[in-house]
Amino acid sequence: MNIQQFWSDVLAQRADEIREYFHADAYVNWHCSNEHFTVEEFIRANCEYNGYGVSVGDWDGEVEKIVTTDDMIITATRVYPKDRSASFHVTSFIKLKDDKIVAMDEYWADDGEAPKWRQDMNIGRKIDLI
């Protein structure tokens, strides 16, 4: 499976192309919001989403890390509106069978500043992204 092309299709919200990456009975779990989706539900959630005042088709992003095993691809991907008015990271555990997705477990987070209590402790520093 071409993981870069998968993410390109997801970010461009191309429903027909996204569908081709999945087995018919595959599922997607979004653990941070406790949601379980069929493939069709995942496609609707992804392709019809226009939150943050962003129109469908105005999303972008970049895959920052890829780890592969025999039957799994793990990605860390940054997702943002094309105007960069918001930013999110998603860690995806993508289980494959016959080069198609059978299960995908995702963990989404909003990007932002450290919480005030940690800032007040004067610990840590910003990550230098190259």
At which residue positions do the language-model features occur?
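Short acidic-aromatic low-complexity motifs
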Residues: 1-25
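Charged/polar, solvent-exposed surface patches and flexible loops
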Residues: 5-8, 20, 44-51, 119
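Tryptophan-centered motif/residue detector
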Residues: 7, 29-30, 108
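A solvent-exposed, acidic/Ser-Thr-rich amphipathic alpha-helical stretch
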Residues: 16, 24-69
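A beta-strand edge to alpha-helix "cap/lid" segment located at domain peripheries
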Residues: 47-130
